[in-house]
Each structure stands twice: as C-alpha cells, then as structure tokens.
Amino acid sequence: MHVEAFLREVQEIARNIDGATVERMAAELASVRDRGGRLFLLGVGGSAGNCSHAVNDFRKLCGIETYSPIDNVSELTARTNDEGWDTVFSGWLEVSRLNKNDALLIFSVGGGDAARNVSINLIRAIELAKARGARVLGIVGRSTGYTALNGDVVVVIPEVNPGRVTPLSEG
C-alpha cells in the first residue's frame, strides 16, 4: 500500500512539474559550461548527499567543472568549528573565487528561511553569489523559501503530500 501511494505521488509530481523551468535550468547549466564557468553544488542533510553524487554526473556526463564543499570534510568541519555553520559555504566560495562566470546549484527541501533561522548557510552563499554576479539555480521542495524567492532559475518540486515533502523533493 505504501509503495503504491508513493509511486502515485511521484507520477503526480512528474505530471505537474514546471517543464519550462526545467528547460531554463538546462540552458543555464549549458551556458555555465560554454562560458568556462564552474558549478558549485550546495545542500545539507540528504541534499548534501545528492550534491556529492551530482558532482560526478555534471563533470562526467555534462562536461561542467563542478565542485561541492561537502566533499572536503576536513575543510567543512574546520570552517564550521572556527567560523560557524552560518558562513561555512560562503567562506568556501570566497576562497574558491566565485565569480560572474560561475553558478550555484542549491539542493534543498525548504531552501532557507532567515526568519526561522533555517539553512542560513545557504542564504549567505546565495547573497555572496548575487553580490559577485554568479547565477543562482535551485531544486527545492518549497516555493516559500529563500532559494525559491531569490534564485535566478529554481525548480520547485510540486507538493503532493505534505508528510513526504523531504523524500519526494530529495528523490
């Protein structure tokens, strides 16, 4: 019963996802590659795992120079310890010399919420990207989060079951 319900929800998402936004995202990613920019993937929790895996796919299958701070546990934990979790990604992006040729791709269920002090690290990274002229892309599970409201091209996974937003968004 659970599997059938889950698969129905996945089908509903596939029917209702904004295909035009997915096409715009693909065009943005191709543009990053064509101008010699780099793609930086950011996410926390399960989305961090998606980032780590996606680095391989974007590099190997798409030919895009791609990185994620998630893949360097030593630096990630040192920055968290010494500078704080809120700036862990923006500090890493500064050292990486994020610039106007580059793009962030945020994987997140909520996308960040300053008022609720949620995923401030993503918000600070987006602010830095905007200040430096880099593009901000996202795949998120909520249309009300910081990423959806401030990104340049953001695919919002249609919410079909509030109780399963996380697994449906991260899947």
Predicted features along the sequence, with ranges:
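Short alpha-helices
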Residues: 131, 140-171
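Glycine-rich, small/polar surface segments that engage phosphate groups of diverse ligands
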Residues: 30-103
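Glycine/threonine-rich flexible loop motifs
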Residues: 112-122
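Surface-exposed amphipathic alpha-helices with a cationic face
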Residues: 59, 124-132
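A short, well-structured juxtamembrane/interface segment
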Residues: 17-35
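Generic N-terminal amphipathic, Lys/Arg-enriched alpha-helix
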Residues: 1-17
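Short beta-strand/turn micro-motifs composed of small residues
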Residues: 70, 108, 138-141
